[in-house]
């Protein structure tokens, strides 16, 4: 970062760079940072104050590292359970989303009055609300009527009360409801979306940041200021083809933001500050607190303390560190430090390795019966992802391999505790039927999530999380619900806001 800033300082105009990061879960593309629980996990806490505290942690770490813009928070609503990006939302309730989006912006920007020298710029996305994808398929046209458009838009209206530095229209969907160029153009290339609605109807005068993969010239002419994914060749072509008055207008907004951030005075990072702030123990503990508070019990029958029991840990996801967070991070394949961070590792640490047996996904290793005082902790759900969910958008049903493990364990008579890594609202009926207890942990975070899960299982913390969305009983229910309408599944298996509270698991 400092090297790039030094090159800028030596250039003719000396204009510093503002680095941005797709940091929806902390400064997560850099190792040794605090990777926070995903937004849907925080939605289950119902705690906007906690969201602000976590956003402030992200601000501290990003600022220390020299990254002064975060492409977060996500102000979308999870109104269709099939959509793969539901994990980035705070759930399907508009009031919860408003409170948490406002809290996240406030934490990132260090206040409610816009950006200053201690801020990280917040880029709220994806305008005008990208939750209602046709059929739940990412990149399909957005579905609205008058009532639901106002509902989804209301999250952004709430966000504007605390003056986010930037707004990002969605780059992969059209908005036919709005008419005009929004019928054919993606939202970040649409004048109707950016000028008529965002600047006109909502009165927004800040920076419009595009998504990635676009026609940069069309986007700028339509109203965008910052072009996502633009390379040097694109810049040269744009300068040659765009009206200079447009460039002047866009540069004015960007320079004003840089002056407010104070990067003209000091664009450099400090190694001592990085060592003190990034990945600190204090930040670890706060991330763990959030993951613990989100844990949601939806079934809880005849449980005894796990202390002293023989523990079977079942399922490949129990050793999959990446699955503890969404895909918006450095991965184990690209350098993520994973040692000691899986759910299996955390259970071994808490119970003692001699009391734990790992079965993985080989159901032939499951015995016909087990001694009394044995519990199987079965970790199920989807692997980590970003836009496209691991199971695809056509189904929310657990794969046969995971269902068979649960059924065979249930038949053995062992106590079965299902731990569900949940990035979407799955069809939970087979898990409920084969388990004595069902604990949903969402995406608890690579940094502290595994330890938080172990704490919840062994009664080291209270369990109080509430579902941030409805849980369907069947795929037929999913197919009958509307993409744009929240809480419209009739007779769900578990309803929005449900969660069994216990002072300690097993007691």
Q: Where are the regions that the model predicts?
A:
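Glycoside hydrolase catalytic-domain context in secreted enzymes
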Residues: 1-507
């Amino acid at each position: 970062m400092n090297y790039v800033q030094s090159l800028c300082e030596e250039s003719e105009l000396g204009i510093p760079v503002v680095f941005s990061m797709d940091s929806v879960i902390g400064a997560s593309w850099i190792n040794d940072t605090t990777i926070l629980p995903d937004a849907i996990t925080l939605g289950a806490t119902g705690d906007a104050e906690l969201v602000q505290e976590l956003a402030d942690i992200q601000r501290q770490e990003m600022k220390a590292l020299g990254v002064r813009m975060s492409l977060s928070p996500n102000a979308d609503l999870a109104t269709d359970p099939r959509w793969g990006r539901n994990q980035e939302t705070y759930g399907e309730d508009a009031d919860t989303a408003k409170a948490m989006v406002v809290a996240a912006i406030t934490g990132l920007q260090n206040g409610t009055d816009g950006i200053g020298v201690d801020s990280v710029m917040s880029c709220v996305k994806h305008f005008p609300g990208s939750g209602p994808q046709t059929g739940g398929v990412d990149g399909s046209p957005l579905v609205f009527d008058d009532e639901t458009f106002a509902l989804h838009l209301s999250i952004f209206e709430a966000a504007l009360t605390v003056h986010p530095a930037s707004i990002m229209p969605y780059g992969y969907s059209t908005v036919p409801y709005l008419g005009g160029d929004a019928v054919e153009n993606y939202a970040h290339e649409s004048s109707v979306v950016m000028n008529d609605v965002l600047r006109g109807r909502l009165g927004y005068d800040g920076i419009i940041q595009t998504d990635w993969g676009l026609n940069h010239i069309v986007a700028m002419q339509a109203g965008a200021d910052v072009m996502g994914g633009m390379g040097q060749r694109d810049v040269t072509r744009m300068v040659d083809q765009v009206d200079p008055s447009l460039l002047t207008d866009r540069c004015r907004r960007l320079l004003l933001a840089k002056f407010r951030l104070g990067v003209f005075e000091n664009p450099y990072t400090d190694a001592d500050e990085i060592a003190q702030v990034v990945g600190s123990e204090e930040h670890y503990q706060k991330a763990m607190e959030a993951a613990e508070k989100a844990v949601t019990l939806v079934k809880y029958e005849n449980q005894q303390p796990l202390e002293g029991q023989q523990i079977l840990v079942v399922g490949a996801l129990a050793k999959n560190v990446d699955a503890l967070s969404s895909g918006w991070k450095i991965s184990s394949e690209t350098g993520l430090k994973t040692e000691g961070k899986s759910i299996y590792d955390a259970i071994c640490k808490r119970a003692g390795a001699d009391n734990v047996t790992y079965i993985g996904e080989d159901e032939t290793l499951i015995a016909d019966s087990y001694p009394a005082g044995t519990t199987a902790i079965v970790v199920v759900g989807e692997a980590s992802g970003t836009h496209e969910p691991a199971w695809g958008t056509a189904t929310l049903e657990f794969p046969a391999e995971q269902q068979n493990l649960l059924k065979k364990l249930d038949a053995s008579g062992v106590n079965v505790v299902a731990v569900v890594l949940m990035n979407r609202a799955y069809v939970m009926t087979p898990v409920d039927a084969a388990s004595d207890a069902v604990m949903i942990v969402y995406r608890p975070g690579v940094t502290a999530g595994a330890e938080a899960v172990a704490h919840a299982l062994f009664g080291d913390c209270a369990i109080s999380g509430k579902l941030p969305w409805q849980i369907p009983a069947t795929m037929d229910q999913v197919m009958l619900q509307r993409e744009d309408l929240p809480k419209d599944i009739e007779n769900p298996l578990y309803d929005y806001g449900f969660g069994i509270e216990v002072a300690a698991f097993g007691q």
